[in-house]
Amino acid sequence: MSDRQQVTNARGERIAIVSGLRTPFAKQATAFHGVSALDMGKMVVNELLARSELDPKEIEQLVYGQVVQMPAAPNIAREIVLGTGMNVSTDAYSVTRACATSFQSTVNVAESIMTGNLDIGIAGGADSSSVLPIGVSKKLAHALVDLNKARSLGQRLSIFRRLGLKDLLPVPPAVAEYSTGLSMGQTAEQMAKTYNISRADQDALAHRSHTLATETWNAGKLAEEVMVAHVPPYKAFIDRDNNIRENSKLESYAKLRPAFDRKHGSVTAANSTPLTDGASAVLLMSEGRAKALGYTPIGYIKSYAFTAIDVWEDMLMGPSYATPLALKRAGMELEDLTLIEMHEAFAAQTLANMQMFGSKKFAEEKLGRNRAIGEIDMSKFNVLGGSLAYGHPFAATGTRLVTQVCHELKRRGGGTGLATACAAGGLGAAMIVEVE
């Protein structure tokens, strides 16, 4: 059996990324305060369709993701279909793979095209850290169920007497891993210690990310892939990511205290991604349908891979496991790539993965390879800045990475690019795209 992955349909047509779009990304409780992930998802899909000048009823499938899900609308994909003028018979379902969610939605639509079930689909993801499912304590939840069954006033009073004042307090969404109790920041701190990553190196990477993102915006490179978002009640709009430190100075990073290990830590708010609101989407077609409709795709999917590792130790190493698998399936080596886009959840996590890309010992012990994945050429790496600057709406990041690398490859005359990310639960994702 060949190791090569055939990302084509039965007619031998490649999977075309026709276009991609995102909202600006905004820090929690700023420009998108009060705007749900669903509303942002509808916003970006509507605009994607408008820019493509494609009849919404031509969309055969929409797969969309959300990490912080709202109980009122658990199938965000279907609600987007119903809210954007698509045919009501359009297939739609939702996925979640933590920070790799929109990698998953993209692959799901691609695989539907590969099997011949459809020719046109939309994938993406959205998350809001400003509109959250605030819950109740387990004791209060239990009592509320019992109250619904109570038949008399005496029974109701008996149930209320079981509750204390602390049981009535609202419960925000958990920030820790369910299985380990560790937050992502604590895991990043763990990785900084495991791989001896200094505070200075973390701060330097964050400064690089913000500096490059500022230059990218100022050069007008993101105009095609970031929409202007008009926010209810439509008296204001946002047209640029608002997390970027446009006057980033390296020396200012050293002033912040560690956020997760106050005494001995090195992970700070400045070298981590903030809680972010935003949405993104890509329009996918079979190569034949794209050409028949007159589109020039921004790229094609060459290969992809998903991996999983243990969650108890350094679980944000996903890129180091998924990337070599995606490269193998594409018949490539790291040095063959024109560009590399790696999700920067934390500077520590990013630097740990970069270090392991070049480690022969890691390759032998963890990957069963006789050579390292390869040393990363920084002239190819996150050349427009990364998540540390742009922000990280969990489910939206994957399609941001894919769209961004495709557009940059276009500007450079084509080539191949890697988009890769770690994700909670020890998950990893990688996708290789080719651009003509």
Swiss-Prot record:
GO CC annotation: cytosol
Pfam family, one: Thiolase_N
Keyword Acyltransferase among record annotations: yes
Top-level taxonomic group: Bacteria
Protein's pathway: Lipid metabolism; fatty acid beta-oxidation
Reactions the enzyme catalyzes: an acyl-CoA + acetyl-CoA = a 3-oxoacyl-CoA + CoA
Gene Ontology BP terms: fatty acid beta-oxidation
Lipid metabolism keyword on record: yes
Keywords: Acyltransferase, Cytoplasm, Fatty acid metabolism, Lipid degradation, Lipid metabolism, Transferase
Catalytic residues in the record: 99, 392, 422
Subunit structure: Heterotetramer of two alpha chains (FadJ) and two beta chains (FadI).
HAMAP family in UniProt: FadI
Protein family per UniProt: Belongs to the thiolase-like superfamily. Thiolase family.
Identification of the protein by name: 3-ketoacyl-CoA thiolase
Gene: fadI
